[in-house]
Amino acid sequence: MRPGAASIRTTGSVLAFLVPSAQCMRSAPAARFSTSPIRCKKDNNSNRGVSAVRGTGLRKRQTLSVLSKKGSGDQPPKPVPITEKVTGTPDHGLWDFFKDKKLIQTPVDESRHGRAWTVGELRNQDWDALHQLWWVCVKERNRLATEKIERARLDAGYGDQENKDRDTVVQETMKAILDTLSERHQAYMEAVELAKQDPSIDLSRTDGPQFVEPAYEGVTCRVAEYTLESFGHVGVGQHLLSEGWHIVTA
């Protein structure tokens, strides 16, 4: 029988035929193999992690002192207390986007409006009145669009139909203004074509009136001078006028 490993006494000398196996029993040196880079023991950049763009702020062990130097006597500034409430400009132009300075109108207030202007009513208005009415409609549509956006942002859930009906009436008025101006432009173009055929109108003239009143030729006017006492009979004056006489009282 082969003796066990425990019964073998360790001796300082190893037999010659056991030398190769004894070398294998020893711990063979292992080569280090790693794809990871060597980790640095210390970061030489003292400002690492402090970025004004990324806003990372201070490092853990970095402190920020606002105290002045010793002996200077300067104290840190103190914030000024707010004594008045900022209200803004009461007559600012942006308030026109909100009716009565309210964020949104109630459906009852939104539905309080009249009908649209008709073309027949706008024909009697001059250019300045049509110009003012047009920009009133533009401002009203801007106000309605602002209320629509605010109503969607607040998720109010009311007033959309009233807002749409009011906007439709404003658009009908603006369309009537455009139709009125189209009629006037068409009438102007037709008048220009007629003026080109009229010999008494010179459209190329820019230094004076383009219309020259023609002189009346071939018309004779007979003048008869009478005193008021000479008209004893009314029929005499009527007869003279019918004959082409021009009566001048002296």
Curated annotation (Swiss-Prot):
Gene3D superfamilies noted in UniProt: 6.10.330.20
What's a Pfam family this protein contains? MRP-L47
Q: Region entry Disordered: which residue ranges?
A: 66-86
Subunit relationships: Component of the mitochondrial large ribosomal subunit. Mature mitochondrial ribosomes consist of a small (37S) and a large (54S) subunit. The 37S subunit contains at least 33 different proteins and 1 molecule of RNA (15S). The 54S subunit contains at least 45 different proteins and 1 molecule of RNA (21S).
What's a Gene Ontology MF term here? structural constituent of ribosome
User: Is Nucleus among the key words of this record?
Assistant: no
Gene Ontology terms, cellular component aspect? mitochondrial large ribosomal subunit
Give the family this protein belongs to, as stated in its UniProt record: Belongs to the universal ribosomal protein uL29 family.
Range annotated as the organelle transit peptide: 1-24
Keyword terms of this UniProt record: Mitochondrion, Ribonucleoprotein, Ribosomal protein, Transit peptide
Signal peptide stretch: none
Instruction: Mark the transmembrane ranges.
Output: none
InterPro entries linked: MRP-L47_sf, Ribosomal_uL29_mit
Q: Which organism is it from?
A: Phaeosphaeria nodorum (strain SN15 / ATCC MYA-4574 / FGSC 10173) (Glume blotch fungus)
Task: Using the UniProt record, give the first listed, main subcellular location.
Answer: mitochondrion
Q: What is this protein called?
A: Large ribosomal subunit protein uL29m
Source organism phylogeny: Eukaryota, Fungi, Dikarya, Ascomycota, Pezizomycotina
Q: Where in the cell is it found?
A: Mitochondrion
Q: Name one GO biological process term.
A: mitochondrial translation
Does the entry feature the keyword Amino-acid biosynthesis, yes or no?
no
